[in-house]
Structures are given as C-alpha cells and as structure tokens.
Amino acid sequence: MTAVISHVTSIDPAARARPEVMAQFRRHSGSVLSGLFGAAAFDEVALVPVAAAVDKTGRFERNFTDRAIRSGFSALLAIWGDAEDRAAEGERLKRMHRDVHGHGKGDFADVRYSALNPRLWNWIAVSGMFVTLNSFTPVTGIKWNDAEREAAYQQLVEAFSALELPGKAGKFPATYIEAAEYYDQMVQTDLAANPFLDRVTAGLGKLPLPSALPAPVRAAAAPLWSVVSAGAGRVVKICSFGIMHPGVRELTGFRWQPHHDVEFNFYTQLLQMAWRVLPDRVVLVPLAYNRLQYEKLVKMHRSVALDSFAPPGGCPMG
C-alpha cells in the first residue's frame, strides 16, 4: 500500500529535485485523475469541531459530490489562477467563513466551533495539500526523492499562501518535515471517531449526482447513475483510503485487508496508464490545460526576441 506520511527527519544533501519530476507534479496538481482520491480529505471531519461545523450546515452530507466539486474548484483556482485571482479567492473564503461559528447540533450539540480558528483552518489546508502530495505516485507511477517532495510541498504552500490567517498561529508548516510531524501529532492527539465521519464514509457506497447539472441532464442520467454510482464510489473509496494515514483510516471504521492492496494496485495501474497515454486536454482540468498552453505561447513569443538591441558587429566608432 502507498505510504502516506513519510517520516522524513532530514533531506539527503545529495538529493536534488529533478525538473522533469517537478513538471509532472505540477501537471498532477491540475489532473482530473487525482479526483479519485478526494475522499482522503475525510480526515478533515475526524477533527470533531470541523465535523460539527459541516454537520450543522448539512451541505456536505446532503451531496458529498457537490462539496467535493466546490472544494476542488477552489483549490484549482489557488494553484492555477493568476495572482489576483488567487488573492481574491483567499479573501472570499475567509470572508464567507466568518459566519461559520457557534455550537453543533444533534450529536455535536456540546461542541463549539469557529471556522477561522487557526487549529481548524490549518488542519483543513494541510489535509488538502497532503491529498495532492500523497496521490502523486499512485496517479503517475513516479517515485520521487525527499528533495522533490519538499519542493512539491513548497509549490502548494506558495499557491495557498493567500489562505493563511494573520499571526504566527495562522502560518502553515514551513517545510514538509514540519507538516508531516504536525499531521502525525494531530492524528495522535486531536482526531477522533465521530458519527459524522461514520456517515460520510458509509455514503461513499452511493455517490450523488452533482446538483449543478441541468435538470434535464440529471433526469436523463439518473437511471444510469444509480447503476454505476456504487462502482464509482468503490473506486473512490479504495483509492482514497489507500493513501489515507492508517491512524485516520482506523477512525473511519474501515478495515484494510490484503485484498484491498490488490484492488488498489489494479486501479492505480490503470490510472498510470491513462497518465502516460492520454493527452493533456483529457487529463487536465480546463484551467490547468489553458494555463500550460498560455505558458507555451509565452515561451514561443519570447524565443524570437533579440538578446540585445546593441548594433551588430560591435561599436561603429571603433
């Protein structure tokens, strides 16, 4: 099974980040294939105040697919958007989360929460970054070294910098090593099994249709979706739980067995084949694809520029 958290205590000084690997990681951060690992972010609701908050709104539980799409689109904007768009998205999220505070309901009636509490906010951010990091090798088949993992983490920290809260407590872990230590500590001391985590884990057995689809499309797709959703949910569950921290997976009640390793390897081999043979237009989300096309065009435009505007052949007065 894929190792989720590498307990790296130092980076080999001889290790170097290979440019081709970093380019592949950047592509991966905009790939539709990584969506199959999205349920690894269930670690977010293993932090009970987060579970209380999302349980109170009901949106997560009503339609997990919608919630995943919204979160994914926001993250993609942070990674692939222009600087102005990234900053605007960060401010939008902070502004909208100001109203997310109070007491939970039902099983969480005694739980107080505030979305802008750095303890909750940073946990969700680090969770999202680790989903992208931990799904890289399963999707691409590329095995990276410690320096490359650190460079990839720094890419994500820079992309999500607009989400950091003010003050020292609002800063994300500065290095991958610190982030891994922080994650392990949260698993050991802060996370807990809870009814909401149980419900969303069980809900993977039948993924709902996205409500953003036009009503006629939803109506036409509903019969087929009712057949394929259980299978799709199974793939998402195995892929996601295959990269999930063992301590978090234990909290979900899901017991990983040897046959799950076989299933995980089968799915990831198919993903790696798709990664190798499918064109970017298919593998990447439109925002990432168009950004890369733009960068290629910029490079082409600059390739015809002169190195200098000085007269050729040296000084004419020489």
Per-segment meaning from a language model:
Residues 1-318:
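Mature, function-bearing regions of proteins
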